[in-house]
């Protein structure tokens, strides 16, 4: 593993389904984050890194749907779904990543990211985005908690 992090906040809604928690935490991007992601997509496209559009970022996550492993959950593929955790992510030629949203018994919500790079482009990309990633994930989780969504 080339990178691993975890952020956690208290849960105000311990009975909430993990898909709803995922949507509450990751489905409410501030406008500046959307702009950064779209700019990143344009810059990385020549390297073969698939990006996102404003349309991709505007689509809400359907929390009423029953998701199965292999389905798209938001922008990423669902790799695992359990009562208290879902894992999404994406694999490409430069790096693979996973995002875990876990509800523990305390009750707390833990959002973790794991990244495995495959080549120099993946390592360079990871090094470039890490400061934004750390700030962004902490902000998304904190905002979701402060707003009472999780």
What are these regions (language model features)?
Residues 48, 52-70, 74:
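Helix-adjacent hinge/juxtasegments
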Residues 102-121:
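Short acidic, glycine/tyrosine-flanked loop/strand segments centered on an H-E-D-like triad
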Residues 139-140:
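Glycine-rich, low-complexity intrinsically disordered segments
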């Amino acid at each position: 593993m080339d990178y691993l992090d975890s952020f956690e906040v208290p849960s105000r809604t311990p009975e909430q389904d993990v898909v709803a928690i995922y949507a509450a935490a990751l489905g409410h991007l501030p406008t500046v984050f959307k702009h950064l992601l779209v700019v990143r997509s344009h810059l990385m496209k020549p390297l073969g890194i698939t990006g996102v559009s404003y349309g991709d970022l505007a689509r809400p996550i359907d929390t009423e749907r029953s998701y199965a492993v292999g389905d798209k959950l938001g922008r990423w593929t669902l790799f695992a779904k359990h009562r208290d955790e879902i894992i999404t992510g994406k694999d490409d030629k430069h790096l693979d990543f996973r995002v875990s949203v876990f509800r523990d018994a305390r009750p707390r919500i833990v959002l973790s990211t794991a990244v495995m790079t495959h080549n120099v482009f993946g390592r360079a990309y990871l090094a470039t985005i890490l400061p934004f990633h750390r700030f962004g994930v902490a902000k998304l989780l904190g905002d979701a908690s402060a707003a009472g969504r999780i």
